[in-house]
Amino acid sequence: MNAEAIIRSIEAEQLKDDLPTIHVGDTVRVGVKIKEGTKERVQPYEGTVIAMRNGGINETITVRKIFQGIGVERVFLLHSPLVDNIKVIRRGKVRRAKLYYLRDRVGKATRIKQRFDRPI
């Protein structure tokens, strides 16, 4: 067994198997574990998936939302223990793999059409 196979077998144990199918353009709500002192709580972060990066245990999604008129982006490691849950709110109909052009848009121009052919 070479080193790469050993690494893959260790990573396979850490992968989450309860993740929903997520696509670019979807609106998702990510529950993030926040530790404040001795207490731990789950903070929801809702926004549009503008990018996905595959790579086994290093799989990430970039979620963008507008907060008080300012665009906020956050990158989540999907298999991280800090990500408690992910729920797809609505499916988006897009024709690009990365939606970085939404960064330059303001207001109603940032809306994405809803997709009805994929179940939530």
Curated annotation (Swiss-Prot):
Alphabetized Pfam families for the sequence: Ribosomal_L19
Q: Which UniProt keywords apply?
A: Ribonucleoprotein, Ribosomal protein
Report the superkingdom from the record: Bacteria
By its UniProt entry, which InterPro entries does this protein fall under? Ribosomal_bL19, Ribosomal_bL19_CS, Ribosomal_bL19_sf, Translation_prot_SH3-like_sf
A single Gene Ontology MF term assigned here is:
structural constituent of ribosome
Return the SUPFAM superfamilies for the record: Translation proteins SH3-like domain
Q: What does UniProt give as GO cellular component? A: cytosolic large ribosomal subunit
Gene Ontology process terms (BP):
translation
Q: Does the keyword Isomerase apply?
A: no
- HAMAP family (UniProt xref): Ribosomal_bL19
Q: What does this protein do?
A: This protein is located at the 30S-50S ribosomal subunit interface and may play a role in the structure and function of the aminoacyl-tRNA binding site.
The Swiss-Prot or TrEMBL record describes its family as follows: Belongs to the bacterial ribosomal protein bL19 family.
Q: What is this protein called?
A: Large ribosomal subunit protein bL19
Organism for this UniProt entry: Picosynechococcus sp. (strain ATCC 27264 / PCC 7002 / PR-6) (Agmenellum quadruplicatum)
Tell me the gene name.
rplS
